[in-house]
């Protein structure tokens, strides 16, 4: 009923309908890239699935790329081919969805994955990420995650690590990986 909807105010629409309106506005000029920032926040599971299906259909129909910004790992697993994990405004890890979910290399990514409920083992205790989120106004010189990281070393506090290539589809910026690579190459692993 577009004739009816065009005359309505946002507060008169459901959350799902507001999301559809936002998607329609974003796609009106047929962009090459759609940036969807938390497109399913505050939507119930049924409407969430409809919105995600709509986005996938439009992506295929219009041949556009979609950059999906979300904290919902379930949505990421269903929707994404490639993933960039960020913490404190910096990229921690990037790779294919398969690499990130089955072979995480950054301690933050590992922590996120440990905190997902396992439907096959509901008795398994969830492991929260220790500490409190970083103050974005007071970032450390080193890795932003270091104060919450069980594997942190002294260098993590003072120097931000370069991205290390794990394989052609996977990179991570973590001193632990750099140390492990040095040790695997016959060094002492001093970083």
What are these regions (language model features)?
Residues 9-13, 17:
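Conserved ABC ATPase signature
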